[in-house]
Amino acid sequence: IPEGKKIVMGEIGFKFVEKADSLYQKENIRRAGSKVNASLEDSQMFVYDYMYGTDMADALIQTVNTGFSGSIAWMLDDAMHSNEAPDKLKIWGFWNIFGEECFGAEEENVRPWYYAWSLLTRYMPAGTAVYRTDTTGEPFVKAAVSGKDGKYMIALVNVSDSPKTVKLKSNVLSSLSGCKKFIYSDGTLKQKGDCLLLPNDENLILHLEKGETVTMPAESLIVYTNYDY
């Protein structure tokens, strides 16, 4: 990115195009074919799975660390776009607002990846600074650190199908107090209603100069923050 310029990544979304992902693509097509209102040509049927949330978190963290000033997720609502016919929807959204009217009431349920995406973006408000992070020894784990006005977010994502243990260290930020900890993974979400994510732990102190050991569930996103909201 040229110095002094800003760039926004638009329409982040995953399609299974690599040979290594061929089995996922076969399953994606099978799921789309079994759903009456899904576009067979342009749907991401893994939006119902927690793994899609960690994939999208991974993409966002890489985008942030590369120097982009913002990003847009593809997409908000299934009801926004159809493909082969008016009733063949592009299944990519956080939900389907017309579920009860046309496509089944369960389609209005908030899907897992909403919680991963909204958690990260909630704690990267406009004007946030992004700090350089280095990850070593574990290719399935990515990290991002950002902050504004003395408040910080530390985000870790594990896209592996097995648990990982990592160590958080900083020679700049010696400690971080008053932290909340959020854990996004299957079976760990704490929610209020169908849209608000609650912390799994609160009032934590991270001793970053000494190092903090963190155990991450498979396919998980962990966020520490001392923002007071």
Locate each region found by the language model.
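Short helix-capping segments at alpha-helix termini
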Residues: 1-3, 174-175
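Active-site region of glycoside hydrolase catalytic domains
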Residues: 3-18, 65, 147-148, 164
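Structural recognition of the beta-strand scaffold that forms the well-ordered cores
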Residues: 6-11, 69-74, 153-156
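Aromatic/acidic polysaccharide-binding cleft in carbohydrate-active enzymes
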Residues: 14-118, 122-142
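Extended hydrophobic-aromatic, low-complexity segments
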Residues: 20, 82-85, 155, 163-167, ...
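Carbohydrate-binding surface patches
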Residues: 135-176, 184-187, 219-222
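Trp/Gly-enriched beta-strand surface patches
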Residues: 175-209
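C-terminal beta-strand-rich structural cap/linker in extracellular carbohydrate-active enzymes
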Residues: 197-229
